[in-house]
Amino acid sequence: MTRPLRISIAVATAAVAALALSSCASGSGNSAVGTVADGKLTIATGQPAYSPWVEDNKPQSGKGFESAVAYAVAKEMGYAKSDVVWKRSTFDSAIAPGPKDWDLNIQQFSIDAKRKKAVDMSSAYYTTTQAVVTTSGSKAVDDTTIDSLKKDAIGVATGSTSIASVKDVLGVTPQVFNSNDDAVLALKSGQIDAIVTDLPTAFYMAAAQLDDGTVSAQFPADGKGDQFGFVLPKGSELTSKVDKALQTLDDDGTLKQLQTKWLSSETNTPVLK
C-alpha cells in the first residue's frame, strides 16, 4: 500500500467518525443553539395546569399568567408563537438531575439554592404576595380594604410570613394554626372569617380545599415573598438568554402588566388599600 493511499483511508475514516458523532448529537435533540429541536422552543408545564397560571389547562392559548409570561419570553428570544412547542412534566422530574426533553419548564418553581445544584434556574418572573382566602358565606368576602378586613377574625399557619404581613398591614394579631389545613378547617367551621397565605397557596385552597372558596383580596407587594423562575437543564445555553429576556420584560413593565391582568383583574382579586 502506497503512502498516499494510507493517507486517503485515514482521512475517510476520520470523516466517517465525524459524521457518526454529528448524527449522535442530532439524535439526542441538542441543536446548535441549545434547544431540543431546531428552530423551536420547547416549554414544559404541569399536567394538569391550573388557573390562573394556565387557563383551561391549555398553555398553547397564551391565557393565564405563566402561559403569557412564557410566550413573552419566547418572543424576546426571537421565537414566534408558532415556534413554541408545549410539553408536560411532573414538578419533581423537572427539578431532578439529568437530561430533559424540553428547553424551559414553568410551573411555580421557587428559586432555591439546593435546586440550582441539579438544574439551572432563571431570574425571577414573579415574587409572591400574601392573599386573603374566604368563603362566599363569610362576612369577610366583601372586605377588600384594610380598614374593613382588620375587623375580621384572620387565621394564618404557624411559621409563615403571613403572620408578620397581617400584623404589619392590618395592624392586628391573627389566630395562628399548626398548618394551613388546620386553618382551612377553622374557616369551614366558622371559627375564623378568612385565611391569609401566599397567593399561589390561596388559589389552591379556594379551588381544591373549599367548596365555596374565593380569593377575595391580595396584600400590596413587599418584595419579601418567594420568587418564581423558569427551570432549565443544568448548564443550558439558554439560561443567560432567558435572564436577558426577563430583564427586558421587567424593565419595560410587561411582567407587571401580565401580573395585573392575570393575577388581579382576571381573577377579581383586588389589592388591599
Language-model features and meaning:
Residues 47, 127-134, 200-203, 207-244, ...:
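Periplasmic-binding protein-like
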Residues 26-31, 83, 162-174, 244-273:
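Ligand-binding clefts/hinges and TM-proximal coupling segments of bilobed small-molecule sensing domains
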Residues 18-23:
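C-terminal motif of bacterial Sec signal peptides marking the signal peptidase cleavage site
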Residues 25, 67, 71-76, 227-266:
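Extended ligand-binding regions for polar small-molecule ligands
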Residues 84-96, 141, 160, 175-189:
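Short helix-initiation/N-cap motifs at beta->coil->alpha
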Residues 79-81, 99-108, 153, 189-201, ...:
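Alpha-to-beta junction loops
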